[in-house]
From Swiss-Prot:
Name used for this protein in its record: Glycine--tRNA ligase alpha subunit
Location relative to the cell: Cytoplasm
UniProt subunit comment: Tetramer of two alpha and two beta subunits.
UniProt EC number: 6.1.1.14
CDD domains listed in its UniProt record: GlyRS_alpha_core
EC top class named in words: ligase
PANTHER family: GLYCINE--TRNA LIGASE, CHLOROPLASTIC_MITOCHONDRIAL 2 (PTHR30075:SF2), GLYCYL-TRNA SYNTHETASE (PTHR30075)
Organism expressing this protein natively: Afipia carboxidovorans (strain ATCC 49405 / DSM 1227 / KCTC 32145 / OM5)
GO CC, any one term: cytosol
Keyword DNA damage in record: no
GO biological process: glycyl-tRNA aminoacylation
Length: 304
């Protein structure tokens, strides 16, 4: 299945490429997240001393970006391909360029540029030195050297690659409208487009996100997720010495829920500018507490 002929072929090619490199190929996290970085395979596994190489597709939701299916390249639900390499290899840029070649983008034939763009996620309490990757004037990927995640310094530094799958697919297929992407690589009556799969969902979720999401319920859900996260964090310490944590992952799930609910409230326009900063801070405090708990788990590097 040729990557330049189908959306799913592009995904399969990236999975094979990074599997051959030595990454474990994970599945998407089964929660509503705003970006692939929120997957615990990146946010939490970037912390601690243990080696970690993983790649996965992650459906991502940004409610405010919906356009009722009327914009050719703006979506409230889209896909990222995420690669996390810890410690970051010295040849990460070369590895990335070879991955582009694997999906049909030859650096010798195209203008590939790396534009400095340091990355920050306020809600995750994370930042890193980064570059946008431009191909013939269009941003197609981002790579970042994580310096801090969840308020915890990254040692060793992890390298993260994020591919915008729809944008890359539009580029290699040569289409101007995301809904025209060939999804399955077939022609004629057997051809399935991106629009066949997702256009109705974009229309319906735009109505939901902007017009009908129950704001009273969402405010309550935020408080419940915030409270549950704090409860699990408190309950997870194995002893009063707080030297080992036993429930970092369930707590982090609640942090993810709080973040998505905040994004829905933001899309509904019921949060003021001042309140918005307060909500971001509240989610960040949860994320930082989860990161602190994680580095006291076995996978986070604690002994015993």
């Amino acid at each position: 299945m040729r990557p330049e002929k189908s959306f799913q072929g592009l995904i399969l090619t990236l999975q094979r490429y990074w599997a051959d490199y030595g990454c474990i190929i994970l599945q998407p996290y089964d929660m509503e997240v705003g970006a692939g970085t929120f997957h615990p395979a990146t946010t939490l596994r970037a912390l601690g001393p243990k080696r970690w190489n993983a790649a996965y597709v992650q459906p991502s939701r940004r409610p405010k970006d919906g356009r009722y299916g009327e914009n050719p390249n703006r979506l409230q639900h889209y896909y990222q391909f995420q690669v996390i390499l810890k410690p970051s290899p010295e040849d990460i840029q070369d590895l990335y360029l070879k991955s582009l070649a694997a999906i049909g983008v030859d650096a010798a034939l195209h203008d590939i540029r790396f534009v400095e763009d340091d990355w920050e996620s306020p809600t995750l309490g994370a930042w890193g030195l980064g570059w946008e990757c431009w191909c013939d004037g269009m941003e197609v990927s981002q790579f970042t050297y994580f310096q801090q995640v969840a308020g915890v310094e990254c040692a060793p530094v992890a390298g993260e690659l994020t591919y915008g799958l729809e944008r890359l697919a539009m580029y290699v297929q040569g289409v101007d409208n995301v809904y025209d992407l060939n999804f399955n690589g077939r022609d004629g009556a057997e051809k399935v487009t991106y629009g066949d799969v997702f256009l109705q969902a974009e229309q319906e979720y735009s109505r939901h996100n902007f017009e009908h999401a129950d704001t009273a319920m969402l405010f309550e859900q935020f408080k419940m997720a915030e409270g549950a996260c704090k409860k699990y964090l408190d309950a997870g310490w194995a002893s009063d010495k707080k030297d080992k944590h036993l429930m970092a992952l369930p707590a982090y799930d609640q942090c993810i829920k709080a973040s998505h609910v905040f994004n829905l409230l933001d899309a509904r326009g019921v949060i003021s500018v001042t309140e918005r900063q307060s909500y971001i801070l509240r989610v960040r405090e949860l994320a930082k507490a989860c990161g602190e708990a994680w580095i006291h788990t076995e996978a986070g590097g604690v002994r015993g």
